[in-house]
Amino acid sequence: PVLKVEIPKPDGGIRQLGIPTVMDRMIQQAIVQVMSPICEPHFSDTSYGFRPNRSCEKAIMKLLEYLNDGYEWIVDIDLEKFFDTVPQDRLMSLVHNIIEDGDTESLIRKYLHSGVIINGQRYKTLVGTPQGGNLSPL
């Protein structure tokens, strides 16, 4: 299971993170290193957060390029509690369609179902994905 901790957000809200064990973090990093190059072509070209070879500066440069091309509107979407409500079966279906590797899929599913520890008590996780581990950005 991951240790659930609450981090204050600048707007006064709370961001809940799931902190994995050191061993889980190492295994997750190995998964990320293998999966990132496979998954990268499937991501939106306009997505810049937590992506290799992308940065705030590159996002701003792309924005300026759009402005120079005549675009006038920007849409900024922040879905509240998005990661807490991701349907795990749908996520795993997408993972399967991209990587088609049963062993890796099984590991990811185990992390999704590993549960959380809150105040020393363990709880099951049937929906959502933990934020705070190496797999989070992927």
Stretch-by-stretch model annotation:
Residues 1-6, 10, 42-46, 50-54, ...:
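Conserved polymerase palm-domain catalytic core
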